[in-house]
Amino acid sequence: MLRWLEIGVLSAILSLGQGHFLSGSFNLTLYRHMPVLYQLDDYDLCLDNKAGTYCLVYVEILPNASSALWHQIDQVSQDSKHRFRHDRVFRGVCLENCKPSINNISEFEKEEILDKELISYYDKVHRRDETNSDRDLFYKDLVKGCLNHKFSEKFSLRTRSLIEYCVSASDKDLKLDLLDLTFYGILVVILFITLCSSFLDYRLRKMSSQKSEGFYREPLKDRIDFGLPPGQRLLTSFSVVRNYHRLVEPYYSDFSRDVSFFDGFRVIGVFAVILGHTLMVFMTVPIENPEFYEQFLFRFETSIFQNGSLVIQIFFVMSGFLLYVNFTKRQQIQPKTGTLECIAVYFRVFSYRYFRLLPSLLALILFNGTLLVRLQNGPFWRHLTEAERVFCRSNWWKNVFFVTNHMLEDSCSHQTWYLGADMQLFELFLIASQADKGNLHNTFSTCHCSTCYTDLRFRAGWYLPYSSGVGFYKL
């Protein structure tokens, strides 16, 4: 056992120093000779000109057997587990800078992007420019000639390109529609109710004999008091101070204290999830030193983040355990309970969980479909947020019915796949909890189906290729 531990530690130490293309040591000088992954012209300066137009372009570098630089690019790109695709790059092009090279367009053969899925994906996402098809057709030829001229002059390589979208200084801002107004209206209503509820709670405290902060920790009774209408618990349900105390109050029941250790697992799990998603986002946005992330993937501890999806299993296990304990404790199903009553209990418990999660999920969908795209503006912002705006408006039903994990293509908020998987496993766990306690065969069969379901989804995601819906992460 000690020898295996020594081998593991030695492997970890050796892995810290790993950093190469496919073999040998990492050479930063050779690395910097390759075309950078992202090169963006000054966005604000370009659009400061009234006639300025800025285009974000996806570029594929064409093979060139006689070029040593191309062989280096191809060698690096083959290591897909640790390296970016350096033969696929993004360029932010200010067309005013390209016009001097417009006479050179005829010198280059106009290559077309072969990835039809990518073209279809961009067509579905960037619908704002449908009315400018003639204008974009001219931009297409101009951008291709400009980029080919630059790559040929600097790297002796040729390219084919695809305009993702173009923005002109004369383009009007995105107009507000009914969905935008609905979201803003909901925000205003929630803010107004919160202020009124907090003020009412403050007034009740002033009228009460208990003036300390303990007033907010005690539940109010629904009675006519101090000349106020009944239903005080409902009217103060949006009180900021009262909800804060409810959030941080200690556990009182024995069961809550017994399972309080789950909070530690939750904190560790949430920390790992947030850290993993943060690293994922940094790998999909323009960065100055992509070699840092590539070298980071060679390190031993990186395997923790690469297998971060396994951390999610902690939440599945906790969810199933708490469901079983609560279900057994309340004894809603007895050995003599009839089938119809079991079905009624199933739908009652499922509906309670469904409608408890739905408001927060709808709020996320509305935010991504309306406000998210307006928070910032820049050369890469639409690339990151436009898909969310479009798909959250058209494919919201995948999230509402919790089937996102089965239908990731063109889905809204990919990260909500967990809610879909958790809800489906919750249904299976609920069925297993209602299985006849006298018939262990039924219980074990249901649990086996749950395990097979989880394993099947994991293996399908591991072996099947990504579709166009997640093409964003492939780039």
Model feature map: region roles:
Residues 241, 292-301, 387-410:
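Extracytosolic (periplasmic/ER-lumenal) interhelical loops and adjacent juxtamembrane/interface segments
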Residues 11, 62, 100, 327, ...:
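Generic hydrophobic alpha-helical segments
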Residues 98, 283, 323-328, 332, ...:
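Short amphipathic alpha-helices and their capping/turn residues within compact interaction modules
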Residues 2-264, 269, 276-312, 316, ...:
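Exoplasmic/lumenal regions adjacent to the first transmembrane segment
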Residues 331, 342-345, 394-420, 427-475:
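Aromatic-enriched alpha-helical transmembrane segments of multi-pass intramembrane proteins
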Residues 379-393, 453-456:
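Intrinsically disordered, low-complexity regulatory tails flanking kinase catalytic domains
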Residues 66-67, 102-106, 283-284, 325-327, ...:
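Intrinsically disordered, low-complexity regions enriched in proline, serine, glycine
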Residues 188-192, 264-278, 307-322, 354-371, ...:
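Hydrophobic alpha-helical cores of multi-pass transmembrane domains in eukaryotic membrane proteins
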